[in-house]
Amino acid sequence: MAIAPGGGLYIPPSPSVSDVICLSNCSELRTVAPGGTIQVTGQHLETAEDVSFKADDGRVKAPVKITSDSTLTAKVPDDAVSGRIRVVGSVAAASSPVSLEVDDSIEIGKGGAVKLTAAQTGPERAYQYGNKKPTIDFITTGGGSSNNLRVDVTDEDGQIVRSYNEESVKAGTTESVTWNGRTESGKAAPNGDYRFVVRSIDGSRAKVTSSVRRAKKDGVNPFRFSIYGYKFPVRGPHTYGDGLGAGRGHQGQDVLAKCGLKLVAARAGTVYFNDTDGRAGNYIVINTKGTGGGSNTYMHLMHPSSLKVGDKVKTGQVIGLVGDTGDATTCHLHFEQWSAPGWYQGGSVTDPTPELKKWDSYS
C-alpha cells in the first residue's frame, strides 16, 4: 500500500505482461543466452520490483530497469532455464503469455555470411499518418560481432521504395526499423502490400534460417504488411443509409450503426470545428492532412468530442461515438467530404460514398 495524494491509503495497480522479447545475446526473438537482456512489455510495470525466471531448483529473481509504465528490461541470470517469466510487483505478480527460451549454446558473430535468425513485422495493416507505423524487429548472427546492414521497403513488384542503412548492428541483438510510409522522394506511398528486406550493406540478402522459414509456412509472413491512406470511420457492424442528394439538402453519406460504437478519424489532420447544432447534433470537422486542404465532417455524435479546435489527430484515432443527436431519427454517422480549401472555407462537398465503400473493403 501507499499514501494517496491528500492522505489515505491506496493499493498500487497490479502489473500485467503482454510480451517478452530478447534484446541482447539472442538467436531468436524469444531465445536468449544467460547474461543476455530481455524486454518485457505490458501495463503498470512501474510497480515491478523483480523479474522471476524459472530455474532447475525453483525460480531465480533478477532486478529490473523500468523504462516506462509499459516496458522494463532485465538481465537473464546464469542459472535461469526456459519457461515463462514472472514480473513481481509490490503487491502482485504477473506471468508472461509466452515462454522464454534460455539457451547457453548460442554463438554470436562467428564469421561467415550474415544470417537472419528471427523476424516479425507489425502491424499487418497500417495507415498513413496513423498511430502505428510498419516496423520490423529482427535478429542477425554470423558475419562479425557487428555488421553494417541495409533494410529495404519494397512494393508488390519488388521495387525499392525506401532504404535504411543500419550501421554497426550487433550480432545477436534485436534491431528495429520503422517505415514512415514515405517514398525516397518524401511522397506518401500508394495503397498496397509491401515487405521489408534485410540485406548486408553490399546489397546481398541476409540468409534466412529455418526458424524464419517455418513461420512463413505456418501462414505468418514475418516481412509483409499493407498500408492504406484512409480508415473506415465506423468500427463495428453497419449499413448504408441516405447518400448525397437525398432530401433536406443531404450533403453526405449516412452510415447506420448502433449507438455507442467507436468513431475514428478516417484521415489524420487538424480539428477545425467542434460544436453542437440543432440539425447536426454533436459534430466535428477535421481538415485532413496530405489532401491539399480538404475536410471530413462527422455528425450526430453521442457526446461532444473531447478534442479541441487545433488538436492534431492521427488516422484511426478515436474521435467520438455513434449517436443520434440533432435531427436524427436513428443512430448513425453522417459523414461529409469537402474539397480544398475545406468545409465552408471555400471548398465544395463531394460524394463520399465511393470512397467510404473502398475504405470499408479493407478496414
What are these regions (language model features)?
Residues 3-50, 56-62, 68, 82-84, ...:
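Beta-strand/beta-sandwich contexts
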Residues 160-187:
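Glycine-centered tight-turn motifs at strand-turn-strand junctions
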Residues 10-29, 103-134, 217-229, 234:
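Short, compositionally biased P/S/T/A/G/V-rich stretches that sit at domain boundaries
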Residues 80-85, 185-193:
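Short glycine/proline/serine/threonine-rich loop/turn segments at secondary-structure transition edges
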Residues 34-38, 130-136:
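Structural beta-strand segments of beta-rich domains
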Residues 266-309, 328-339:
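Zn2+-dependent peptidoglycan hydrolase active-site motif and core
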Residues 195-282, 315, 324, 353:
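Surface-exposed, glycine-biased beta-strand/turn segments
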Residues 109-119, 217-235, 256, 292-294, ...:
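Acidic, glycine-rich catalytic/binding loops that coordinate metals and/or anionic ligands
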